[in-house]
Structure formats: C-alpha cells, structure tokens
Amino acid sequence: MMLRLLLVLGLIVAAVISAPCFAAADRVALVIGNARYPDADPPLKEPVTDARDLAEELKRDGFDVDLLENASGEAMRHALDRLYGRIKPGAVALLFFSGYGIQSNRQSYLIPVDAQIWQEADVRRDGFSLETMLGEINGRGAGVKIALIDAARRNPYEQRFRTASAGLAPVTAPSGTLVMYSAALSAVVADSGGDHSLFAQELLKEIRVPGL
C-alpha cells in the first residue's frame, strides 16, 4: 500500500504541480477538512491540519485555493458552486476532502459536519456524491481533474444501519481524472493520532520535494 501510495502521489504531483503551462488562474482547488462531527467524540485530529497545510502548499504552487474547515452542508454547497464557477476551459481542478465518507448504492459520499444520518437514505440526502462532483467539474471544461479523498475512516453513522463499515466505492470518472483514496476500496483506516494522516503526510512530502 505504501509503495502504491507513493507512486500515485508522485504521479499526481508531477502531472500538476510541476506543469509550467498552467497559470495561477488556471489552477483551482477546493480543500476541505471536516473534524468536528457532533456524532463523533472526540473530534478527528487530522483533517483540519491536513487541509490547512495542503492549502498552503497548493497556494505556493500557484493554485487559487478555497479552504473550508468543519463545513456544513450549506457551506460545502456554496464552496462547490464557487469551485465550478472558477474553472476555465482546460484548467486544473483539484478537490481534497478529509473527514468522513460513506459508500451508498456503489457511490462514495463526502459527509458535512451537520449531516443527520440514521439510515442509508440519509447518506444520499445529506452527503455529496464524489461522482456527481467530478461530473460537474468535467462539465465546466477542466482539462485535468484531481480528487484526493481521505475519508475511509470508521465512522459513527454506519453502525446505525450496517453491521460493518463499507469503506468507499470505486468511482466512474471522466477522462483526464485522477482519483486517489487514502485506503483500498471498501477498506477503512484509523486516524494515526498525529498531526497528519499518512495520506496527507506523503502528499505533502511529495509536494515539498525541491525542484518541483
């Protein structure tokens, strides 16, 4: 898993961060770190720090970054609308999400902090479909679409309607899209307990390589 993570993150960084042909206005990113879910106690340790540090690195590399912390459903909707509106034809569009994610009907949903999830239908009502978001980004003309999803955590919601966490689902993505999960499909990972998740730690390490 570590070798694969390093290889894929290296590919992502090399394909985007080091591409000189994209001006700042042609690189847009939405970075979300959700840690304070009322149904989760204590709050997650890693998502906000991961999001802040990644946002800073992306800004240094020429991205126009929108950073959200502990975002409600309304805040995520508005931020996604802003992201879609900032995309120019051929642009690089990057989405990073750290928090809880849930699989439903073979799609992965990113969960805002104010979600009210008691049954599986609530996931589709309150969550944000990754597949739908990537389709919208593609429809706005982005040339390179990147989704970095650190949401395969065991969460407090699924135990209400499942015997075990289902992890995240494979995504049917448009061409020119790179999707990277922090764990294998349908698998779950625990927080490291440190300042950064392993996923974010390796991503930041790749971005900070001198010369990129």
What is each stretch, according to the model?
Residues 2-109, 114-119, 159:
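Boundary/activation segment at the start of structured domains
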Residues 26-27, 63, 142-144, 174-177:
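Short glycine-/polar-rich loops that comprise or flank the Walker A/P-loop
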Residues 27-29, 209-212:
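Caspase-like cysteine protease fold
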Residues 34, 151, 182-184:
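Fold-independent oxyanion-binding glycine-rich loops
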Residues 55-59, 169-174:
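Short, conserved catalytic or adaptor-binding loops enriched in Gly and charged residues
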Residues 74-98, 102-160, 191-199, 204, ...:
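Caspase-like (clan CD) cysteine peptidase catalytic core
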Residues 159-167:
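Short, surface-exposed loop/helix-turn segments at secondary-structure junctions
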Residues 174-202:
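The feature captures the short pre-catalytic strand/loop hairpin that immediately precedes
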